[in-house]
């Protein structure tokens, strides 16, 4: 809903027609990689920066010195070379179905290591790192918190408890309220959307030992066909005209633009916690693709292509 509303507002403000396609961030990266410098789209809007950083490393984004970047609350929320700019922050955590946990006589997990306890076997929903940027962020987060080898052992143990790896990062949040999974791993603002849609059986949990965050970003594709319109989009995306309509369309992320109206829900549900790690974006830029390969080697003894398609969804 937010993507559609943002495009409509851009058309109203500038008289430029916008065609858009909603894909997970991993799918966007795969698409622009295949298009190899002749992209079918001009800009990328939304989604975690881990796939953006992969695209930077592959030379697929066009740097731009955006004037409205002066309104970012910190330089943390932009690429040092202007390849992408952040518009919101999303906190990684757990969403749990309290009714199902009560029925099963289980306590809610409070930290990452709780997720691998045997009593949660088959109860966890998480996204597929071959398609979802959210899952790539989870992988990078565990590598940065635990070290590479321990992180891969962790994912091997976690896999025993995972019911399904969804195509999109928001997928698990949509499963937890109806009870399709009992514990969802993803961005907590997606959980807020579900709670406010009527699922009052969902509880949000920020991992006690620390967590990380996404920077939801926007960027210009290298070789795009409408460069001036693309630059205008970046300025627009970094403005209140764009970000203030997020909350009107069930998107409750913590905004990182100083002249924006912060959604009350983001503050109410604690989406600016004080225990986030000092996320290493440079490491993510250099190594995400390798870490994803290592993840599949750990949990499937092979590649993403060999993964069980009934659990690792790509559609």
Q: What is each stretch, according to the model?
A:
Residues 1-17, 94, 194:
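Short, polar/charged alpha-helical segment
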Residues 1-4, 26, 39-180:
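Extracytoplasmic ligand-binding site segments that recognize negatively charged/polar headgroups
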Residues 30-37:
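Short, well-structured alpha-helical segments in soluble
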Residues 50-54, 177, 182-201:
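A ligand-binding cleft/hinge motif common to bilobed small-molecule-binding domains
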Residues 90, 154-159, 165, 199-222:
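Periplasmic-binding protein-like
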Residues 216, 221-278:
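Mature extracytoplasmic/periplasmic domains
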Residues 277-315:
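Conserved C-terminal helix/tail region of periplasmic/extracytoplasmic solute-binding proteins
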